[in-house]
Amino acid sequence: FISIKDLTAVLGVTRSTTDRYLKRLEELKKIKRVQGGAMPKQSDFSFCPSWYYQDDDPFYQERVALGKKAAELIGDMECVFLGGGRNILHLAKRLVNRKICVVTNSLPVSLLLAGTDNEVNVVGAVPISDEGILIGNSNSNLAVQKAFIAPGSLDEEGFCNHSQLIVEFEKEFIAKAKEVVAIVDTQKFQMTSPYRICSYEDVDGVILPNSAPDDYKAIFKNNKARTYYV
């Protein structure tokens, strides 16, 4: 059980906004509304399908390695933007015992880091997917040193995503950040998405598996972005 009061405090939003979150999550059949709060419909308080977290995900170990490498790029006391997705969640797991400022539009990330020594700022107002990703007000006053994104796919020109709303939201933080890092797992090389997040020239670093296709390795080798293989 989590109370509306506690969830409102964690997210730093108004009670009415929390009510909208819970209503949407109930519509997605992720929670059950009860008096004063909500209960999970799964065994853990997850806004995502069980495979989102568990090692029955065929790319689980790869995501763990990608998240570990990404966390190594974050210095203590830095302010970073963390987008949504499983790869980002594995990065967030490595930050539980750190002390940094996190700006995120991911409900799973914000709840994972709540109660730690990290300062967590949740941006966005409306959950638009069963992964608990928020869009809406990005808070133009927030400045970040680094932005970490997990694109849904790649093509010859850059990183893409399936949702235009998510793309437009992440573009704001890509423009704000002094450094942008993309985290890419093997699955993303096999997928296509209609909306472009940014070109390869717009990122400063790319973290990807050693199993990445040779043609993409060649693209990154000829690009200004630092490439990290795991």
Task: Write out the residue ranges for each language-model feature.
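Residue-level recognition of conserved structural "scaffold" positions that shape functional pockets
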Residues: H90-A92, E131
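Conserved phosphate- and dinucleotide-binding cores of soluble alpha/beta proteins
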Residues: S3-K5, G12, E27, R33, ...
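Short, active-site-adjacent cap segments at secondary-structure transitions
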Residues: M39-P40, I88-H90, S110, D155-E156
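HTH-adjacent hinge/linker in prokaryotic transcriptional regulators
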Residues: F1-K5, A9-F81, A92-C101, L113-N118
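Short, well-ordered beta-to-alpha junction loops that form the rim of enzyme active sites
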Residues: G84-R86
